[in-house]
Amino acid sequence: MPGDGGERCGSIGGMSTTGAREPGWVQDVIWWHVYPLGFVGAEREAGPDQAVVHRLGHVAGWLDHAVELGASGLALGPVFASGTHGYDTTDHLRVDPRLGDDADLDALIAACRERGLRVLLDGVFNHVGRGHPAFRAVLEHGPATPTASWFRLRWPDGADAWRPGTEPEYDDFEGHSALVALHHDEPAVADHVVEVMTSWLDRGVDGWRLDAAYAVPTSFWAGVADRVRARHPDAYLMGEVIHGDYAGFVAGAHVDAVTQYELWKAVWSSLNDGNFFELDAALTRHGGFLDSFVPYTFLGNHDVTRIASRLTDERHLAHALVVLLTTGGTPAIYAGDEHAFRGVKEDRAGGDDAVRPPFPATPRELSPLGLPTYSLHRELIGLRRRHRWLHTARTRTLHLANEQLVYEAVGDGGRLVVALSVGDRPAEVPAAGVRVVLAGNAEVADDRVRLPAHGWAVLEG
């Protein structure tokens, strides 16, 4: 893929660390995250003899949009054969026929390479769909089949009493019987995961998002990660972790990063409640994570309500984006958020559809109502790319009140000051050492910044 891979990092922000291991190229990545099955308008379920429909070219048609936005990487949701939503994988080595075939994915990877975009794939290795050949063999041939050890099975009346048609009980993923949990103590499972990951890295992708990584023992990930990096030392491995000991997981699993859900929640919750104390606490914890790894940061993804719908005041969408792009992390923009797409996730069958919509053939067909948000994304992404050190920047609070927050982002000799207000009246806040407004709307005088109602600004000396 484009550019020098560089060495794996051993320091963050000029400070020595013991856990930082990400590839050097990650410093410059801003992901544009796409959920392919929704993006291309694929059928909700794959048929038993699903014909190949060449739809991945639809994603390729939007790559110039990603580049113009300022993104430098494409983070793809599930692209492998599955029964429904992509997270019930039936073949990790074959593209979902609803999206196309392997040649289509190869072409998409090549199109990314031509534009200087890195590629991240979504790997579901905690569980498989019931239609996966390894589990299907168990149903057809019983406990003696070689892949029976891939799963935690409980046979009625015992394995010796098995008869054709007898189905075992099995561990699943969080109560979803369609998602059969893998047995991660089984060496053959690790061998399979390593084969899948290295096969696609061999074909030109740059890394993996590890779905439901929190549900898998860190010892399993550590063994897999070490074997994958033996062949692909510059591969980026990022695990989905919702809460808990982020730094401990990264160290134990030998991954580069995890999803930063704590910061995601604090951003929209603080803005909605007019309570910047919550965000301040989250930024303090975030700084602690940066001592050992660089989190994967985001405002939206395929699993959560769109940020434009989550916020109770649309004026605060800018504030949320400012925080994302002026704090340490590897940021991702969920496709559509840059045009203020709305969508509410619901806890029901099909409840994700609103946040995984089909996209038109080209960006020109989008509503012009989203253009101001698109322009803001371009402005702030451009600011971040001009200040590369923000990737590992630490924040320090300069002023804190319920409705106002001023913090400085510092790193590698650089310094920016961010001022935010969600109050209904203009606010004057301290901000020593700044003279220039880089983005936003503010007046600067005598080490103080005057913000309009619901205003924000990014400043420097």
Question: PLM ranges: what are they?
Answer:
Residues 446-461:
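C-terminal beta-strand-rich structural cap/linker in extracellular carbohydrate-active enzymes
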Residues 16-184, 188-195, 202, 209, ...:
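Acidic/aromatic-lined carbohydrate-recognition and catalytic surfaces
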Residues 176, 432, 452-456:
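Tight coil/turn sites that cap or link beta-strands
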Residues 22-27, 42, 46-47, 51, ...:
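Loop/helix patches that line or flank the sugar-binding groove of alpha-linked glycan CAZymes
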Residues 109-115, 132, 136-143, 195-198, ...:
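Active-site-proximal helices and loops of the catalytic beta/alpha 8
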Residues 71, 205, 255, 329-330:
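A structural motif
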Residues 416, 425-441:
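Beta-strand-rich binding/interaction modules
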